[in-house]
Amino acid sequence: MSGIENSGADAGEGRVKNAILIAGPTASGKSALALDLAERAGGVIVNSDSMQGYSVLDVLTARPEAADLARVPHFLYGHVHPGTAYSTGAWLRDVMKLIDDGMLSRRPVFVGGTGLYFRALAEGISEMPDIPPRIRDRWRYELKEQGAVKLHGLLLREDSRAAMQLKPTDSQRIVRALEVLDASGRSILEWQAERGRPLIDRQTARFLVIEPDRAALVDRIERRFDQMLDKGALEEVRQLAALGLDPDLPAMKAIGVRDLQAAMAGQLSFPEAIERAKIATRQYAKRQATWFRHQLGPEWQRLRPGDDLETTMQTLVANAT
């Protein structure tokens, strides 16, 4: 069965039918579950995690390994240079290209931990203007020179409504608002009000969010980071450092990068850097779980400790036909 519906706009023309969405905090086992599900359903896997899209960071972002990639087709993993500020809109455009190219004709399983990706997929997203490199570079330079608080003051004068919705220290969103205003002459709020169409057919889609036991998750996080070190995480950090990238880029903020860089520079001991990275991972997982708990709607099935995983899998496969 085709993954694209062609029965008319009212029925969701051009949207992916029978999509399966799997969300969960980092280290919750969602990638393994998605792989099993994709094999059973004869489907493909689409990365829905903002960090796993970056190249170089194979190990530190826990991307699927070669053996898993060989089992079913995987898309949107490691395809973005770490020097790029990859956005939700860019990810959605990449998904649209997969659809246009017929790559999602088999049942797609979207899996990841980036809640905004799932929201954009199911609800649509505002189309933002393209930002010319000269404008992007200008505002990155201004951020370095002036700092977030001063740029927030500038935004307050130029676009007070947008500025009032942002914390003065939220450098990434402040710069984004200034870039959009500079490139288009319109407030980012105006662009955000123009929401696009969803890319999936919600009526046939199936939604699953993993809610793991907290203690078990902490244990998995601890063990997984140790395994990352054994698999070459330090070499990835060296490769990333060799690129000489802006430290404010999203890829440079991947968990473990700054701590391990500090240890390699002699600013921290390696045990201290490792412990900091593990703590940051636990905190990130907690934020993800909180977001999923409060932001995902009733259509999302919750997979909790003690639930029958096999029954859940069978239901998802049976319903997605």
Swiss-Prot record:
UniProt site (Interaction with substrate tRNA): 114, 136
UniProt-recorded Gene Ontology molecular function terms: ATP binding; tRNA dimethylallyltransferase activity
Assigned EC number: 2.5.1.75
Binding site for substrate: 26-31
Annotated binding of ATP, by residue: 24-31
Keywords, alphabetical: ATP-binding, Magnesium, Nucleotide-binding, Transferase, tRNA processing
GO biological process: tRNA modification
Annotated region described as Interaction with substrate tRNA, given as residue ranges: 49-52, 172-176
Gene3D superfamilies recorded: 1.10.20.140, P-loop containing nucleotide triphosphate hydrolases
Keyword Magnesium: yes
Catalytically driven reaction(s): adenosine(37) in tRNA + dimethylallyl diphosphate = N(6)-dimethylallyladenosine(37) in tRNA + diphosphate
Source taxon at top rank: Bacteria
CDD domains linked: NK
Family matches, as Pfam families: IPPT
Magnesium listed as a keyword: yes
Cofactor(s) the protein requires to work: Mg(2+)
PANTHER family: TRNA DIMETHYLALLYLTRANSFERASE (PTHR11088:SF60)
Physiological role: Catalyzes the transfer of a dimethylallyl group onto the adenine at position 37 in tRNAs that read codons beginning with uridine, leading to the formation of N6-(dimethylallyl)adenosine (i(6)A).
Family, as annotated: Belongs to the IPP transferase family.
HAMAP family in UniProt: IPP_trans (MF_00185)
Assembly and interaction partners: Monomer.
Protein name as it appears in the record: tRNA dimethylallyltransferase
